[in-house]
Amino acid sequence: MKIDKLEGKLILKNPKIIDPLNETIFQNDVMLDNNKIVQIGSIKLTDDIKTIDCNGLVLTPGFCDLHVHFRDPGNGDKETLESGSKSALAGGFTRVCTMPNTVPAIDTPELINNTKLKNYQYIFIL
């Protein structure tokens, strides 16, 4: 389930939460305020706060794909940094590591830095 950027408060009611930091999986409510988690626990519902029933759904941190082929630079007709980043984000991946199978191959510090700088324009926030 994708939640578009919202202003104000939102309650995710009863998702299964995977917390890798504490190595726990539990079920509870989550309150967001301007897209930031502000409370986890039993939250009293009110009519003025939008609520989404997440029973049966899983809430996790974003995933990292360690092997992507964006083909940019050189073969942008197959996949660009922008299209690949948007596709990754739609699939729950908030970080990606691109392979150097590009033209030219991204295999020198200079090319890595240039690609990194180009990537900054493709930071997408949900």
Predicted regions and their residues:
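Hydrophobic/aromatic beta-strand patches that form the interior of the parallel beta-sheet core
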Residues: L12, K50-I52, C64, C97
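Generic alpha-helical hydrophobic packing signal
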Residues: K16, D29, I52, I125-L126
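Active-site metal-binding motif and surrounding structural segment of the metallo-beta-lactamase
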Residues: K44-L59
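Metal-associated gating/positioning segment near the N- to mid-region
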Residues: L57-N119
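N-terminal metal-binding scaffold of metallo-dependent hydrolase/deaminase domains
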Residues: M1-T46
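Short C-terminal domain-edge/linker segments immediately following a structured domain
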Residues: S42, T46-D47, F93-C97, L126
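Short helix-capping segments at alpha-helix termini
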Residues: N119-I125
